[in-house]
Amino acid sequence: GYEEREVAETVRELDAA
């Protein structure tokens, strides 16, 4: 769903930080 996609994107950004 939309939330899952947003969460996945946030996780990527946090992991790259």
From Swiss-Prot:
The keyword Secreted applies. GO terms for cellular component: extracellular region; host cell postsynaptic membrane. Keywords: Gamma-carboxyglutamic acid, Ion channel impairing toxin, Ionotropic glutamate receptor inhibitor, Neurotoxin, Postsynaptic neurotoxin, Secreted, Toxin. One of its GO terms (molecular function) is ion channel regulator activity. Its main location: secreted. Coiled coil: none annotated. Expressed by the venom duct. It is found in: Secreted. The modification 4-carboxyglutamate is found at E3, E4, E6, E9, E13. Conantokins inhibit N-methyl-D-aspartate (NMDA) receptors. The mature peptide does not contain cysteine residue. This is Conantokin-Qu.
